[in-house]
Amino acid sequence: MLDPSIDSLMNKLDSKYTLVTVSARRAREMQMNKDAQIENPKSHKFVGKALEEIDAGLLTFEKENR
């Protein structure tokens, strides 16, 4: 079982594509700056930490209106 679950993550964002994009960008940012917002992450990988931040509500995304 993955933690956080895809169901809880999909409640935070509107699509799987958005979830992947936001978490990948945040993971790259963490690799460069070493600044995780979660104090005790369960995952040791950057993408896992980014997903935990999304699930905790620390990382949000607003859709751009075109």
Curated annotation (Swiss-Prot):
SMART domains registered for this protein in UniProt: RNA_pol_Rpb6
Gene Ontology CC entries for this record: DNA-directed RNA polymerase complex
Cross-referenced Pfam families: RNA_pol_Rpb6
A biological process term (GO) from this entry: DNA-templated transcription
Reaction(s) this enzyme catalyzes, per UniProt: RNA(n) + a ribonucleoside 5'-triphosphate = RNA(n+1) + diphosphate
Enzyme class: transferase
GO molecular function: DNA binding; DNA-directed RNA polymerase activity
SUPFAM superfamilies: RPB6/omega subunit-like
The keyword Transit peptide appears for this protein: no
Superkingdom of origin: Bacteria
EC number of the protein: 2.7.7.6
Coiled-coil region(s): none
Assembly, per entry: The RNAP catalytic core consists of 2 alpha, 1 beta, 1 beta' and 1 omega subunit. When a sigma factor is associated with the core the holoenzyme is formed, which can initiate transcription.
Family per record: Belongs to the RNA polymerase subunit omega family.
Task of the protein: Promotes RNA polymerase assembly. Latches the N- and C-terminal regions of the beta' subunit thereby facilitating its interaction with the beta and alpha subunits.
Identification of the protein by name: DNA-directed RNA polymerase subunit omega
